[in-house]
């Protein structure tokens, strides 16, 4: 019996030793396992870090009774994040449904994702490996397989591009005062009765008032004289010219003491021997018998004599024409042309500061566009909104100014007030940018896509959203051809480094935030152009010193981390 018990213990010990030696051997030889990580340096796109790991096991490495669980973990200062799934592998004798690695060797391919955090820039990707054989478990210890995360996609500029509502202020507005002098048939003299007509009296008074009004400037006077088309050209041509002379004489007398009337080209005369256009217009407005027939004659014949003959053949209709239509055509039309001159920009600003209530809404909105001081601009638009509560433009512009001041919540509130007055594409665009700056990408996209017609601004906003989603081709298309930092960033992220560089180089003015200069430095590093990299990195730091610390941990510059010039630049 003692022999049997000793024999059993010996067998059990041998089994345990065999299990342990299998695990220990795998751990000891774990350096023979090869790992390939794609990308070699992790990157964040669309707010996540994706990784592909390919592991290759040599022959006679994987114990056939062992199950191995590999857990990818990203470790960084202050914490760590485990990827969303693990990789389980098993030897060929294990009864389970995991990936089998035989004694002849094998491989696996793993893909996983984690949400990105800023702390992950300087990090290590490790595999934590646990092996199980029967009831025995052995941790192999972490295996480092990659360094850090490149976070260039997070540089996307989410600053808003709200659309200001324009004023419709026009400083100079043309105005014309009209009057007619009518003549007896075949006469060119002005009947004294005509000069007492209401329109003539009003014209005289208008000329006097304008001549002493500094806000109105006399520009010109047009005199157009006509003869009715019921006579011959031989009679009507000199007749219309004589009527022009009498009308011209009359109107010039009214300007006799006004200096501007002495300038060359102030008076313009024109004569029309047969006023067929006027005839047609008067007939169209009338209810005269045979109206349609008369108009048909005009459309069928262009010869004045034929027209006259055909119309005079309509006996009853012609009698009506002689009394109701033709007398209206024997006339001289006078038009005094004036420019109404509004306030200058300087006057608008002065009045806005003194008493804005004396300005109309267009002048108030104009005032807002004349100052570069955002706080003063806000004050002007608030006054415009207070005095014009039904005009959405004032509230909209308040919102735009608040966004420029970094007060996004208040800006959104103003856009909502504007929306309550008039919900249009401008408001949708601006609410979209308000949501984008606040980080509500889904809401921003909803606003932009709800617009009746896309604008360059809304397409820009959709381009920003596309970058945050990792849709770089779409972003490039949305941004269009206008050089911008975000366009260059999208080009770089999609792999078109040369075009990204040319886009940045063609920008007329670089943002004082330093982002364009910093991206240039990143491109310089990518192209291994040390001088280009350093000069632009220094420029970025000159704009904003924070880029020093950022560059220190940016793996875009990994190849230069030991370079003395780089180190001195970011110290």
Question: What do these predicted regions represent?
Answer:
Residues 2-513, 520, 524, 529-535, ...:
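N-terminal targeting segments with Sec-dependent signals, encompassing both cleavable signal peptides
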């Amino acid at each position: 019996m003692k022999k049997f018990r000793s024999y059993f213990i010996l067998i059990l010990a041998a089994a345990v030793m065999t299990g342990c030696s299998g695990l220990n051997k795998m751990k000891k030889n774990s350096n023979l396992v090869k790992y390939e990580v794609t990308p070699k340096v992790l990157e964040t796109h669309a707010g996540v870090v994706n990784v592909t790991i390919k592991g290759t096991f040599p022959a006679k490495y994987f114990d056939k009774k062992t199950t191995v669980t590999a857990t990818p973990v990203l470790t960084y200062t202050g914490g760590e994040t485990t990827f969303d799934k693990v990789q389980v592998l098993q030897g060929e004798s294990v009864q389970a449904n995991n990936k089998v690695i035989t004694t002849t060797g094998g491989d696996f391919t793993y893909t996983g994702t984690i949400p990105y955090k800023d702390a992950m820039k300087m990090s290590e990707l490790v595999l934590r490996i646990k092996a199980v054989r029967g009831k025995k478990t052995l941790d192999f210890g972490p295996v480092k397989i990659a360094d850090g995360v490149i976070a260039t996609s997070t540089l996307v500029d989410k600053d808003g591009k709200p659309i200001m509502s324009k004023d419709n202020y026009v400083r100079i507005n043309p105005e014309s005062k009209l009057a007619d002098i009518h003549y007896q048939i075949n006469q060119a003299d002005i009947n004294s009765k005509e000069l007492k007509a209401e329109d003539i009296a009003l014209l005289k008074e208008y000329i006097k008032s304008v001549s002493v009004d500094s806000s109105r400037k006399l520009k010109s006077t047009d005199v157009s004289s006509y003869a009715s088309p019921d006579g011959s050209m031989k009679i009507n041509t000199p007749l219309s010219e004589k009527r022009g002379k009498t009308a011209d004489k009359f109107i010039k007398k009214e300007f006799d003491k006004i200096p501007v009337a002495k300038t060359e080209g102030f008076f313009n005369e024109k004569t029309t021997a047969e006023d067929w256009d006027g005839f047609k217009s008067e007939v169209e407005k009338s209810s005269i018998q045979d109206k349609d027939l008369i108009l048909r004659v005009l459309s069928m014949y262009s010869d004045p004599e034929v027209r006259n003959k055909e119309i005079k053949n309509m006996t009853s209709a012609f009698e009506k024409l002689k009394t109701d239509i033709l007398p209206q055509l024997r006339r001289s039309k006078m038009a005094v042309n004036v420019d109404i001159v509004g306030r200058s920009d300087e006057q608008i600003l002065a009045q806005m500061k003194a008493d804005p209530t004396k300005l109309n809404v267009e002048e108030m909105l104009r005032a807002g566009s004349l100052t570069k001081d955002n706080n003063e601009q806000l004050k002007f638009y608030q006054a415009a909104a207070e005095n014009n509560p039904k005009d959405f433009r004032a509230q909209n512009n308040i919102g735009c100014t608040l966004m420029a001041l970094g007060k996004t919540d208040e800006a959104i509130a103003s856009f909502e007030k504007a929306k309550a007055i008039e919900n249009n594409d401008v408001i949708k665009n601006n609410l979209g940018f308000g949501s984008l700056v606040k980080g509500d990408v889904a809401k921003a996209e909803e606003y932009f896509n709800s617009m009746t017609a896309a604008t360059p601004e809304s397409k820009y906003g959709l381009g920003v959203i596309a970058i945050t989603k990792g849709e770089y081709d779409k972003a490039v298309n949305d941004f269009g051809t206008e050089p911008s930092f975000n366009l260059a960033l999208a080009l770089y992220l999609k792999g078109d480094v040369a075009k990204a560089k040319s886009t940045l180089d063609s920008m007329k003015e670089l943002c004082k935030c330093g982002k364009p200069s910093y991206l240039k430095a990143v491109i310089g590093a990518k192209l291994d152009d040390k001088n280009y990299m350093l000069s632009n990195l220094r420029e970025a730091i000159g704009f904003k010193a924070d880029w020093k610390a950022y560059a220190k941990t940016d793996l875009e510059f990994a190849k230069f981390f030991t370079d003395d010039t780089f180190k001195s630049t970011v110290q």
